[in-house]
Curated annotation (Swiss-Prot):
Gene encoding the protein: trpE
Catalytic activity: chorismate + L-glutamine = anthranilate + pyruvate + L-glutamate + H(+)
Pathway(s) annotated for this protein in UniProt: Amino-acid biosynthesis; L-tryptophan biosynthesis; L-tryptophan from chorismate: step 1/5
One GO term (biological process): L-tryptophan biosynthetic process
Function, as annotated: Part of a heterotetrameric complex that catalyzes the two-step biosynthesis of anthranilate, an intermediate in the biosynthesis of L-tryptophan. In the first step, the glutamine-binding beta subunit (TrpG) of anthranilate synthase (AS) provides the glutamine amidotransferase activity which generates ammonia as a substrate that, along with chorismate, is used in the second step, catalyzed by the large alpha subunit of AS (TrpE) to produce anthranilate. In the absence of TrpG, TrpE can synthesize anthranilate directly from chorismate and high concentrations of ammonia.
Mechanisms controlling activity: Feedback inhibited by tryptophan.
Pfam families xref list: Anth_synt_I_N, Chorismate_bind
Family the UniProt entry places it in: Belongs to the anthranilate synthase component I family.
Cofactor dependence: Mg(2+)
Protein name listed in UniProt: Anthranilate synthase component 1
Coiled coil: none
Length: 462
């Protein structure tokens, strides 16, 4: 098979930002995305903008389609991989992703791989899998202050035409900045009343005492009519809560606006890596308080025990698809600092077994134990019983799969799901044996606060 080549043009990036490039390229585009990253207070080397959809891969109600045409399959992730994978000519100046597909896999995608009860309504009605193959990608190299316009393909004339179009858009004027208000102030309503959530926690504690599970994550969804443009939410969120996985994915029927703190799964095509995060403290006022809080976190038996449980779950998930003897735990139980909090983090890696792909690993890991519980299958059965609706995108993953199998998928947390004129925010609390129901309810609201603050900022005008 002939390799896909990165046809590209390179410019100085001193007159553009990822936001301005996105606004220029995405104007009137049916689908578009912006992926950025801020880790440990610093912007990562690359930001990526993509527009257009050469192909759209969609899964809903057991029907997998490519550009609207049905494809028969029992394994939608394998079907996606087989249609995306192609030999790729890499370039040393470009990041792991400059062509392939970008999108999300919902929490409920697990139903295609595990038998779970179907007790609750799917009120959002969104796809379980939705990925697009962009026509043009703009890569910002913040280290070298360069902007690469890339049109991946095999036909140089066709790729050059796409580059010409994108260059004209970039050199044109900045269009109107999305920020218009739909009117009114957001009024978020929870899908659980306070008492109903407390009762769900009490029932979860009964399951824990009976020995069914060690932990289950019960989430609360907050919903409001949309009052601002989704991109205004993104601009506010990147200011309020800069995170390792910033994402704005306008996929047509749904928009994801994310400031996720957590990687679900990364791969270079052969090696797979997951990084469970469990255990949290706020950042200190200064370096000395930071150090004290980190030491306190490492001494907290409850936090450490919960982390070790989820670390074991991640190790088992990777072990299902890795070659024998290749699963390793790197840097177990170390403290990482983020903009507002610090977390206990471990790294688990393995080498894919013969015949396994990165998307087989995604099927094994999804959903992560940090959003479901342990043991995972029984915890998900209890979630289906106790939560009022299907979760949809929340608790799943979003990110990219490059043509050659390189992949980076984040956990869909701290994310607005915008669809059908509504915006939804969902947050969960891990219920364990000594949980206090009232505190778990407050934890859900506390986790949602950064997103609610972003709504207020966007409504006030940026």
């Amino acid at each position: 098979m002939e390799r896909i080549r990165p046809y590209r043009k390179t410019f100085l990036a001193d007159l553009e930002t990822p936001v301005t490039a996105y606004l220029k390229l995405a104007e009137k585009a049916p689908v578009s995305f912006l992926l950025e990253s801020v880790e440990r207070g610093r912007q990562s080397r690359f930001s990526i903008v993509g527009v257009g959809a050469r192909r759209t891969f969609r899964l809903k109600d057991g029907v997998f389609t490519v550009n609207g045409e049905r494809v028969e399959t029992r394994d939608p992730l394998r079907a996606l991989y087989e249609r995306v994978y192609a030999p790729l000519e890499r370039h040393p100046d470009l990041p792991p992703f400059f062509g392939g597909v970008v999108g999300y896999a919902a929490y409920d995608l697990v139903r295609y791989y595990e038998r779970l009860p179907s007790l609750k309504p799917d009120d959002l009605g969104l796809p379980d899998l939705l990925f697009v193959e962009p026509e043009v990608v703009a890569v910002f190299d913040h280290l070298k202050n360069l902007l690469h316009l890339v049109a991946p393909g095999r036909d140089p004339e066709e790729a050059e035409a796409r580059l010409f179009w994108a260059e004209r858009r970039l050199k044109g004027p900045l269009p109107g900045v999305p920020g218009e208000r739909a009117g009114g102030r957001a009024r978020f309503q929870a899908d659980f009343s306070r008492e109903a959530y407390l009762e769900a926690v009490r029932r979860a504690l009964d399951y824990i005492r009976a020995g069914d599970i060690f932990q289950v994550v019960l989430s609360l969804r907050l919903s409001s009519p949309l009052t601002v443009h989704p991109f205004a939410l993104y601009r506010a969120l990147r200011s309020v809560n800069p995170s390792p996985y910033m994402g704005y994915l306008d996929l047509g029927e749904v928009v994801l606006v994310s400031a996720s703190p957590e990687s679900l799964l990364r791969s270079d095509g052969r090696r797979v890596v997951t990084r469970p995060i469990a255990g949290t403290r706020p950042r200190g006022k200064d370096e000395e308080e930071d150090k004290r809080l980190a030491e306190e976190l490492l001494r907290d038996e409850k936090e450490v025990a919960e982390h070790v449980m989820l670390l074991d779950l991640s190790r088992n998930d990777i072990g299902r698809v890795a070659a024998f003897g290749t699963v390793r735990v790197l840097e177990p139980l170390h403290v990482e600092h983020y903009s507002h909090v610090m977390h206990l983090v471990s790294t688990v890696e393995g080498i894919l077994a013969e015949g396994k792909t990165p998307l087989d690993a995604l099927a094994s890991v999804l959903p992560m134990g940090t959003v479901s519980g342990a043991p995972k299958i029984r915890a998900m059965e209890i979630i289906e019983e106790l939560e009022p609706h299907r979760r949809g995108p929340y608790g799943g993953s979003f990110g990219y799969l490059a043509y050659d199998g390189a992949m980076d998928m984040a956990l869909t947390l701290r994310t607005f799901v915008v669809a059908k004129g509504w915006m939804h925010v969902q947050a969960g609390a891990g219920i364990v044996a000594d949980s206090v129901p009232e505190r778990e309810y407050e934890e859900c609201w506390n986790k949602a606060r950064a997103l609610l603050k972003a709504v207020e900022m966007a409504e006030a005008g940026l």
